[in-house]
């Protein structure tokens, strides 16, 4: 019996050993085989809980409960950071938003006419950054990077309760890409004109400008953007295979067709609308290889792998060497570095791809051949002033992926992983401030983001503080000396973008996997509405014995969400007791208007007893938070009694609190939307209604204006500009000096930079209005090289489209200056009234994006982080120098 038991136990142990060994092999195959040549077929056959292709809500996944979390061991709550970084993409959504699943109340439907100009539905997708253009190159890159994060760290997303959220955000973008691909060789790569879009500052829900659609096809191709979209959809086909097999197949179908389109055309000749915003500087071969690698992983078709490798000699080399490039970063323009890493793992040897990715990561960490990326004093690996954190955190994500690779160098893997942690921690606040909105200590509160700011006045200055919290947004980041300004106008340091968060999400997933941290189970972006959104301001224009004249201004400052109102009305209540006592009636009262912005006025109507009202109906007049003339409408109306009759306003309900010479918000003048009370209180009501919690429809009517200006930028070499004939004969009129002041702020304080970003404020302290078309500003600098230069106006209170920029060479170079940028204004800029000011935020760069040395520039002031008087920039009015000193 003992022998049998002993033999039985041995058999059992042997069987268990075999099972364990076999399970280990399967696990290894799953984890690492998928990272070499697996197509995830064996994984794709499984389901995730009860999620299937039959899930409701258009294929979007339901919100999941956050599982119990293990104890956190890291310096930060990486789970919360991951949760919020994913949420940021919900804030960027364009199109029709489902209120049943929306996790924030300050976003609504927007861009619902996108594609109508082309007869196609192009709604959906993400707005690019703090603007509202849908640029498909950075958008598809962002979707691809988010998908890669899920591919690598799916378990982290599940454990943190963020799996469905990230899949839904990726699907939101991919659904849009599929819409953009209506035919095999046709792809719509952009919606919205960048110049017109940047000329307006307001919420997405009430955009007034036309939004043209741009496409590439076989006659005018765009291989870069098409291949990047192919990559995004190929990755989506892999990660959605578990939860929605049909959708996975649809993504793969489009990915294959788009790749063939990009690969057989090999040209970006048709990709023109994004020039000046998202040029494809690295060419298209990196995107072709990147897409081919992902298609190989999605299909196991080795022809894609062969194709990816065949372009490796076209990815680029370091200047004057035969060394594959390594001194940049994975980004929307250049996906070479991610391709290095994927091919290194697939080949799984010590070949050229492994050498290439290690060379790249070495340069970012310990250095390569005695050279290393710049590090700030506080530890940020700093590549460039535009999105410095974006580059560091994305490279850190690649470092994490390398560290997981079984065949990677173990010592390097440790170094890379420590680098990744340090960069994640820098972004989250290791220096004493967080660079993620709504997270950690001293986070950014004023990101360069139109909808989060919530202006109703087409102005970065109104309101002075942001109305909404853009949770999870990673801002651009500091300069090379750790300097950072939380300023809405500083788009260099403080803009946010879809591609900024893309690699950051993957990095946070790895940090969460290593160190834990608890996402907030109650987190959302639902905000209290702290102010009246729709209301009337009123005052007394004039009065006499038998009349009262009221000036009333209807305001729409809606922001939860912003919305267009076309059916507003208000009522002015009066008590006609004195009229009745004089033997007259309501029919004897006359209502007239001397000034009216689109309203219809009723006769006096009965309310109850001796209380009557005049209804001012603005139906058909669009009032929306889109600018000074858009968000408010004024009506001046008079109520007159017959001659010899006294009209006493003191007993009128709506007269309460009104006075002459000023207007005040009045709850006694109730406002209605389509007949529903949305602000104020009627006579006899116990409490007032406010637009904070009204039942206004969240549907946003389309705003159209009669015409929209298109902002322009000069894109010419300095030598193409003739030195102005008046350059050496400028009249020195010091008599007006002091009446007009030019202030300067530096939007980019780096000594070495590939763009110069001055900001100007002109202040009129005089007594006369200034015609802005007579005004010129000059900024003096050294050009360093012969490349032509580009000029952009990023924002101006005079309207971007009304700002011009011209470069010219000084006839006699001076110390610190051989070139001058002259900024002017078009006739549409209007006048600058006494006591007023106008702001201009511009930037310029060389066509080849080579660096300037700002440190020796005459007009450069590195300490001017905010507006300050600076006499090394000059101001001219009608060719008279009125401020500053020429070099």
UniProtKB/Swiss-Prot annotation:
Residues 529-684, 736-887 form the CBM3 domain. One of its GO terms (biological process) is cellulose catabolic process. Residues 56-518 are annotated as: Catalytic. Belongs to the glycosyl hydrolase 9 (cellulase E) family. Its EC number is 3.2.1.4. Pfam families: CBM_3, Glyco_hydro_9. This enzyme catalyzes the endohydrolysis of 1,4-beta-glucosidic linkages in cellulose, lichenin and cereal beta-D-glucans. Principally active against barley beta-glucan. Residues 1-55 form the signal peptide. The lineage of its organism: Bacteria, Bacillati, Bacillota, Clostridia, Eubacteriales. Residues 686-729 have a biased composition (Polar residues). It catalyses: Endohydrolysis of (1->4)-beta-D-glucosidic linkages in cellulose, lichenin and cereal beta-D-glucans. GO terms for molecular function: cellulase activity; cellulose binding; identical protein binding. Coiled coil: none annotated. The gene is celI. Pathway: Glycan metabolism; cellulose degradation. It comes from Acetivibrio thermocellus (strain ATCC 27405 / DSM 1237 / JCM 9322 / NBRC 103400 / NCIMB 10682 / NRRL B-4536 / VPI 7372). SUPFAM superfamilies: Carbohydrate-binding domain, Six-hairpin glycosidases. Residues 40-66, 441-460, 684-730 are annotated as: Disordered. The active site is at residues 131, 448, 486, 495. InterPro entries: 6-hairpin_glycosidase_sf (IPR008928), 6hp_glycosidase-like_sf (IPR012341), CBM2/CBM3_carb-bd_dom_sf (IPR008965), CBM3 (IPR001956), CBM3_sf (IPR036966), Glyco_hydro_9 (IPR001701), Glyco_hydro_9_Asp/Glu_AS (IPR033126), Glyco_hydro_9_His_AS (IPR018221). Keywords: Carbohydrate metabolism, Cellulose degradation, Glycosidase, Hydrolase, Polysaccharide degradation, Repeat, Signal. This is Endoglucanase 1. Residues 43-53 have a biased composition (Basic and acidic residues). SMART domains: CBM_3.
């Amino acid at each position: 019996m003992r022998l049998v038991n002993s033999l039985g136990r041995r058999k059992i142990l042997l069987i268990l050993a075999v099972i364990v060994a076999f399970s280990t092999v399967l696990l290894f195959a799953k984890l690492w085989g998928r990272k070499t040549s697996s197509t995830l077929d064996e994984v794709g056959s499984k389901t995730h809980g009860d999620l299937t292709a039959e899930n409701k809500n258009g294929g979007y996944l339901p919100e999941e409960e956050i599982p119990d979390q293990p104890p956190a061991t890291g310096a930060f709550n990486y789970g919360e950071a991951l949760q919020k970084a994913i949420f940021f993409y919900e804030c960027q959504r364009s199109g029709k938003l489902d209120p049943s699943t929306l996790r924030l109340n300050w976003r609504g439907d927007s861009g619902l006419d996108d594609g109508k100009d082309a007869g196609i539905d192009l709604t959906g997708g993400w707005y690019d950054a703090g603007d509202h253009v849908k640029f498909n190159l950075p958008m598809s890159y962002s979707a691809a990077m988010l998908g890669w994060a899920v591919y690598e760290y799916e378990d982290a997303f599940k454990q943190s309760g963020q799996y469905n959220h990230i899949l839904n955000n990726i699907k939101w973008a991919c659904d849009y890409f599929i819409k953009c691909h209506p035919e095999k060789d046709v792809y719509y790569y952009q919606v919205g004109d960048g110049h017109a879009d940047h000329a307006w500052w307001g919420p997405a829900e009430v955009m007034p400008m036309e939004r043209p659609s741009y496409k590439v096809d076989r006659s005018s191709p765009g291989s870069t953007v098409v291949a990047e979209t192919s990559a995004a959809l190929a990755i989506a086909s892999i990660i959605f295979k578990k939860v929605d097999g049909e959708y996975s197949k649809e993504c793969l179908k489009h990915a294959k067709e788009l790749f063939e389109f990009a690969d057989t055309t090999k040209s970006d000749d048709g990709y023109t609308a994004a020039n000046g915003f998202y040029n494809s500087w690295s060419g298209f071969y990196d995107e072709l290889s990147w897409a081919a690698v992902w298609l190989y992983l999605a299909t196991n078709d080795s022809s894609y792998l062969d194709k990816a490798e065949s372009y490796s000699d076209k990815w680029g080399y370091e200047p004057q060497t035969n060394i594959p490039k390594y001194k940049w970063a994975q980004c929307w323009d250049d996906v070479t570095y991610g391709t290095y890493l994927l091919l290194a793992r697939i080949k799984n040897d010590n070949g050229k791809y492994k050498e290439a990715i290690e060379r790249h990561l070495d340069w970012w960490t310990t250095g390569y051949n005695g050279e290393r990326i710049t590090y700030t004093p506080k530890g940020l690996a700093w590549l460039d002033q535009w999105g410095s954190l974006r580059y560091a955190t994305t490279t850190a994500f690649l470092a994490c992926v390398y560290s997981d690779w079984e065949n990677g160098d173990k010592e390097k893997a440790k170094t890379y992983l420590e680098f990744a942690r340090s960069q994640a921690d820098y972004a989250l606040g290791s220096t004493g401030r967080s660079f993620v909105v709504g997270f950690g200590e001293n986070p950014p509160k004023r990101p360069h983001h139109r909808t989060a700011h919530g202006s109703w006045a087409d102005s970065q200055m109104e309101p002075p503080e942001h109305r909404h919290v853009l949770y999870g947004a990673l801002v651009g980041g500091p300069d090379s000396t750790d300097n950072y300004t939380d300023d809405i106008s500083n788009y260099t340091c403080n803009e946010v973008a879809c591609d900024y968060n893309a690699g950051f999400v993957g990095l946070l997933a790895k940090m969460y996997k290593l160190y834990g941290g608890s996402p907030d189970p109650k987190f959302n972006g639902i905000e209290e509405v702290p102010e009246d959104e729709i209301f009337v301001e009123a005052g007394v224009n004039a009065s006499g014995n038998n009349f009262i004249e009221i000036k009333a201004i209807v305001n729409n400052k809606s922001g939860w969400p912003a919305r267009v109102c076309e059916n507003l009305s208000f009522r002015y209540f009066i008590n006609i007791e004195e009229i009745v006592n004089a033997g007259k009636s309501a029919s004897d009262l006359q209502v007239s208007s001397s000034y009216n912005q689109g309203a219809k006025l009723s006769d006096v109507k009965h309310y109850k007893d001796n209380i009557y009202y005049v209804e001012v109906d603005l139906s058909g007049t669009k009032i929306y938070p889109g600018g000074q003339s858009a968000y408010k409408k004024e009506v001046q109306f008079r109520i007159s009694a017959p001659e010899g009759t006294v009209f006493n306003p003191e007993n009128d309900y709506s007269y309460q609190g009104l006075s002459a010479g000023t207007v005040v918000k009045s709850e006694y003048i109730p406002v209605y939307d389509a007949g529903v009370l949305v602000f104020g209180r009627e006579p006899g009501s116990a409490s007032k209604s406010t637009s904070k919690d009204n039942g206004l429809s969240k549907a946003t009517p389309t705003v159209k204006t009669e015409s929209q200006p298109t902002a322009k930028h000069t894109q010419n070499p300095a030598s193409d500009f003739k030195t102005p004939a008046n350059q050496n004969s400028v009249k020195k009129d010091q008599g007006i000096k002091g009446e007009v002041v030019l202030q300067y702020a530096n939007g980019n304080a780096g000594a070495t930079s590939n763009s110069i970003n001055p900001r100007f404020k002109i202040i009129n302290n005089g007594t006369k209005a200034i015609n802005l078309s007579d005004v010129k500003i000059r900024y003096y600098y050294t050009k360093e090289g012969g490349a032509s230069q580009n000029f952009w106006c990023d924002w101006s209170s005079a309207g971007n489209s009304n700002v011009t920029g011209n470069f010219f060479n000084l006839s006699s170079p001076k110390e610190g200056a051989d070139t001058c940028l002259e900024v002017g204004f078009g006739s549409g800029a209007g006048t600058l009234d006494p006591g007023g000011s106008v702001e201009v935020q511009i930037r310029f760069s060389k066509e080849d994006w080579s660096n300037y040395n700002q440190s020796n520039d005459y007009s450069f002031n590195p300490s001017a982080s905010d507006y300050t008087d600076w006499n090394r920039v000059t101001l001219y009015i009608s060719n008279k120098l009125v401020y500053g000193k020429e070099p």
